[in-house]
Amino acid sequence: MLKTIFSLIAIIPMTLSFKKQFFWTAFISSSFLMPFLFFIFTPLSFNSSFLMHLQNKLFGYDMISAPLVFLSLWMLPLMALASQHHMKKSPLSYQLLYITILIIMQTLLILTFLSTNLMNFYILFESSLIPILLIIFRWGNQKERINAGIYLSFYTLIGSLPLLASLLFLSNTLSTLYIPILMMESSEMYHSPILWLGCFSALLIKTPLYGFHLWLPKAHVEATIAGSMTLAALMLKLGGYGMIRLSLMPFLHSPKLSLILISIALWGAVMTSFICLRQTDLKALIAYSSVSHMGLMTASIMTLSLWGMSGAFIMMIAHGLSSSALFFLANSNYEKTNTRTIILLRHTQMLLPLTSLWWLFIILTNLAMPPSINFISEITIMSSLFLWSPLTFPFLALTMVITTTYSMSMFMLAQGKLSKMTKILSPFSTREHLTLFLHLFPMIAIMAYPNMIINIFC
């Protein structure tokens, strides 16, 4: 595991040893080796989800963290491929700074997933905010990026203060924050609603829960493509991963507060789906769609059942890949048309038929068409919530209907007869087709061998 981390950091000096014209080729090629090195150096067992393989006192992995680490490593070369067109005209020093920030961000995310101590998790959890803020502030295209960065930092830091206070209280009373030990602690003396809210506050904001979601659309719209892909594929998953870890600790179970949270999450999923129907900005639409999906994930985790956590975990992987691909497609359209306004993108897919096919594939996975892993995750989530309470079914059904409506309308708006004002667009490059294929490849692999993630909690 640590070999993978050191290899990831070593990409920077290795890339510098190549000539300027091979800079991005060397970085992308070496980044592609990282997921495979992780498999080689990390012995995995698909039948021991809660057996943590400890590397030292601070870091370890199990079948909950390992897939998310692999997803983090897999996304690094995809972010580089997506950013190449945007960054190639910048000075070499800026390009080096950019990939250094990407590697630092991925390293912090991986170490967060591998943390076996809650205080260590908290420090890395908050540290991962710094690289994404740098990307938004330095490489954002519009002056609104300052406002987006302020929203992101304000929401995240305000939510982190109760989490820090709760961890200090637990450390003082239990004398440990070691996750494997806390998973065995079942004393009822720590069952406190205030402690529960403190522990989950920062995670619910990072997910984000409806009501604390205002930072996400702003951050997505103003971030570069690598920032949007990181937010969609990995940053939002930090909240879900943390909630799963804490929900596996018996002394943090609170059925009454879970009931309130499930109600808010399902209501938020419906409301953000309605908001998607009225969006005019393509990236904002995809961002609100992420809030809706994360609402379902949060509700599933709060059922406190292994079946619900399994569905939430599958959705984390599936949504990470599909939403990242959607943001890449939106950015590619923006690079060719210089607009994200949906009404101005009408008929553009008639000029790019192969691109239209990619849109269809990614949208179908995002709205959970079988046999995609998104479909498996939503069926599992619906089953767990229906078993928890049949009253949740109307909210689930309404969310799925609205999701299908705005997803297909987003696709159909780009079809139709060409306007006389439509300019000729350059076709997708091999780089763009490769990036989209590499988003779909893990989904196809999991569909072929679903036990990789389905049986983790079973």
From Swiss-Prot:
Keywords: Electron transport, Membrane, Mitochondrion, NAD, Respiratory chain, Translocase, Transmembrane, Transmembrane helix, Transport, Ubiquinone. GO terms for molecular function: NADH dehydrogenase (ubiquinone) activity; ubiquinone binding. The chain crosses the membrane at residues 22-42, 63-83, 96-116, 117-137, 150-170, 194-214, 224-244, 257-277, 284-306, 311-333, 350-370, 391-413, 434-454. It is found in: Mitochondrion membrane. It catalyses: a ubiquinone + NADH + 5 H(+)(in) = a ubiquinol + NAD(+) + 4 H(+)(out). InterPro entries: NADH4_N (IPR000260), NADH_UbQ_OxRdtase (IPR003918), ND/Mrp_TM (IPR001750). Its EC number is 7.1.1.2. The keyword Iron does not apply. GO terms for biological process: ATP synthesis coupled electron transport; electron transport coupled proton transport. It is a multi-pass membrane protein. The keyword Iron does not apply. One of its GO terms (cellular component) is mitochondrial membrane. Belongs to the complex I subunit 4 family. Core subunit of the mitochondrial membrane respiratory chain NADH dehydrogenase (Complex I) that is believed to belong to the minimal assembly required for catalysis. Complex I functions in the transfer of electrons from NADH to the respiratory chain. The immediate electron acceptor for the enzyme is believed to be ubiquinone. This is NADH-ubiquinone oxidoreductase chain 4. The gene is MT-ND4.
